[in-house]
Swiss-Prot record:
Organism ancestry: Bacteria, Pseudomonadati, Pseudomonadota, Gammaproteobacteria, Enterobacterales
Protein name per the record: L-carnitine CoA-transferase
Biological-process GO terms, alphabetical: carnitine metabolic process
Main localization of the protein described in the UniProt heading: cytoplasm
Gene name as annotated: caiB
Catalysis: reaction(s): crotonobetainyl-CoA + (R)-carnitine = crotonobetaine + (R)-carnitinyl-CoA; 4-(trimethylamino)butanoyl-CoA + (R)-carnitine = (R)-carnitinyl-CoA + 4-(trimethylamino)butanoate
The protein's Enzyme Commission number: 2.8.3.21
Catalytic residues of the enzyme: D170
UniProt enzyme class: transferase
Involved pathway(s): Amine and polyamine metabolism; carnitine metabolism
Length: 406
């Protein structure tokens, strides 16, 4: 890698250069993770039109912090040349587009490897780089990937399926790009040979929706959707109402079932053929007493405040938690102790508040060192970093191939 762009050195990925081209959430989320873990991350934007995420009032300050902003037309003339020159000093390149869009425009894996044989290339799209032509070139967002993967149909309630929000497929796919690119980089460091990764968002969600799908693939059984937030198969698991709000709980384990049955007045069922000794889960459908257990549990919970319920469930070693509202997060003692929510300065000097770096590395922690850069803010510095003169940069700008902030 060439000399770093100006930034502090920190985290487990200090010294790694990552470049990404993509808008909105999925692809940029991958880049964001690298940036928070110490990599030097360059965000490529269109010259004429900035990333559409910029229209949001607050989210971009989180999703684009720690980045370097390059505004460059990478598919045309001198802009393409500058992009390929940048690839020579890049460790990981992530692009999010419709199928093989880069290859269609002449930037194939082979072209990139001609300029950098060690380059890790991550292609992120809705339907993959190859397959049935009626799908590979289609646009895809969160809901599209959820719908096509079998993930969406499993969510919602018995009356209607519904997507899991916010933007689950985007974040899962972005994190898949991050982890797979790191796996590829590890191998490149051993072999010296680059890698290309084909990440289809629908396949990511297919994998994430795997749990109950296996019952269908191997037995033809379709799992029912939830009812009012309760786990479809197992009683005592899911969302429950108390006097003053909601909790979630998971009644799993021999001792846990025995003790909760005693508390709610069902001790006489323990040791029966339907609830034999050693029962670890109560099947909502197959157990004749599954619905009775749910009904008694609902009544027991509805007549108590959350604090009392959580205290008793903790005594019984039953996993549970209050469903926190967003305003409750900041003052929660666990959030405070771990600084899960933090503040940083935007490029305009304003204070922004949001989630802190995760996960927490003990010896090489991540950090927030910069707010979201303006459109084209670092174009000049990046082009100079890869060897361009002031005159060459001005020529790109005059031709509309690059944008700089004066």
């Amino acid at each position: 890698m060439t000399e770093h762009l100006p930034m502090p050195q920190f985290g487990p990925l200090a010294g790694v250069r990552v470049v990404f081209s993509g808008i909105e959430i999925a692809g940029p989320f991958a880049g964001q993770m690298f940036a928070e873990w110490g990599a030097e991350v360059i965000w490529i934007e269109n010259v004429a039109w900035a990333d559409t995420i910029r229209v949001q009032p607050h989210y971009p300050q989180l999703s684009r912090r720690n980045l370097h902003a390059l505004s460059l037309n990478i598919f045309k003339d001198g802009g393409r040349d500058a992009f390929l020159k940048l690839m020579e000093t890049t460790d990981i390149f992530i692009e999010a587009s419709k199928g093989p869009a880069f290859a269609r425009r002449g930037i194939t894996d082979e072209v990139l490897w001609e300029h950098n044989p060690k380059l890790v290339i991550a292609h992120l799209s809705g339907f993959g780089q190859y397959g049935d032509p009626q799908y590979t070139n289609l646009p895809a967002y969160n809901t599209i990937a959820q719908a096509f993967s079998g993930y969406l149909i499993q969510n919602g309630d018995k009356d209607q399926p519904m997507p899991a929000f916010p933007y689950t497929a985007d974040y899962f796919s972005g994190m898949t790009a991050t982890t797979s690119a790191l796996a590829a980089l590890y191998k490149v460091q051993q072999t010296g040979k680059g890698e290309s990764i084909d990440i289809a968002m629908y396949e990511v969600m297919l994998r994430m929706g795997q749990y109950f799908m296996m019952d269908y693939f191997n037995g033809g059984e379709i799992c029912p959707r939830m009812t009012k937030g309760k786990e479809p198969y197992y009683a005592g698991c899911g969302l429950y109402r108390c006097q003053d709000g909601y909790i979630v709980m998971e009644v799993v384990g021999i001792t846990q079932i025995e003790e909760i049955f005693k508390d709610i007045g069902l001790a006489h069922l323990l040791g029966t053929p339907e609830v034999p000794k050693g029962t670890q889960l109560i099947h909502r459908i197959n157990c004749p007493h599954g619905q009775l257990f749910e009904d008694e549990l609902d009544e027991w919970l509805a007549n108590q405040p959350i604090t009392a319920v959580l205290k008793r469930l903790s005594e019984l070693n039953i996993a549970s938690a209050k469903v926190l509202t967003i305003p409750e997060l900041e003052g929660n003692p666990q959030y405070v102790a771990r600084e899960s929510i933090t503040q940083w300065k935007t490029m305009s000097g304003e204070t922004c508040k949001g989630p802190n770096i995760m996960p927490k590395f003990k010896n090489n922690p991540g950090k927030i060192w910069r707010g979201m850069p303006a459109h084209g803010m670092d174009t000049n510095a990046i082009l100079k970093n890869i060897g361009y003169s002031d005159e060459q940069i001005r020529e790109l700008v005059d031709k509309g191939l690059a944008k700089i902030v004066e």
